[in-house]
Amino acid sequence: DGSSVYESSLKSLIDEYLRTHENVDANRVYIGGCSNGGYMTVKLVMDYPEMFAASFPICEAYKTNLISDEEVVKLASVPTWFVHCVNDPVVDINTTAIDLYERMKEAGAENLHFSLYDSIVDPDYGNTYNGHFAWVYSLKNLCTTDYDGSNVTVDGNQVNLYQWLATNSK
C-alpha cells in the first residue's frame, strides 16, 4: 500500500545521527539501499526530498502504481541513480524501477541515472548470481553506465556510482 512501519523510526535515526554528529555535512546526506532498503530509499526521498543530496536505490521494490504524480515530482527533484538487473526473480523491474525511472524523467529529473544489467556475474571469479543481487556491481564500484549504455560522466570524466554521489550536495 506504499506505507512502511519502519519509516518514522528510520527518519528519527537519521535525524538523531545528524543532530549528534556535528562534523557531518547535512548538505551531503545520501541514501541508498537494496531490495526493501531500496523501497525505503524511495519512500524517504519521496516524503523528505529536502533532506537528501542524492539517492541510489538498488533493486528497489516500490510499486510505482502506488506513487502519485505529485510524489514523482518530489522524487525527480533529488539526484538519483538506480541499479537493477533485468532477470531479477524477486522484484518485477517493470512495475518498479523502470517505470519509476521513466516517470521521473517525464517529471523533469535532471540528474537521473540507471545502471541496468542483463545478469549478475562476479567480475573476479565468473560466478553467476541470482539476478536480485544487483548490489554486487555497486559494491565493486562497477556501476558506470547509464540506461542507454553510455558512460555516466561528470565534467567530461567517467564516474562510478560513488564518485557521482560525492559530486552531489544540496
Question: Where on the chain are the PLM-derived regions?
Answer:
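Short, proline-enriched alpha-helix->beta-strand connector loops that line the catalytic pocket
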Residues: 74-80
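Alpha/beta-hydrolase-fold catalytic nucleophile elbow
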Residues: 32, 58-59, 83, 117
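A conserved short beta-strand
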Residues: 50-63
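Acidic-and-aromatic substrate-binding clefts and catalytic sites of carbohydrate-active enzymes
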Residues: 2-7, 61-67, 89-91
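C-terminal catalytic histidine-bearing segment of alpha/beta-hydrolase fold enzymes
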Residues: 83, 89, 105-170
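Short alpha-helix in the alpha/beta-hydrolase fold that links the catalytic acid
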Residues: 92-104
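Gly/Ser-rich "nucleophile elbow"/oxyanion-hole loop immediately N-terminal to the catalytic nucleophile
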Residues: 2-35, 51
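Short glycine-enriched nucleophile-adjacent loop
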Residues: 38-49
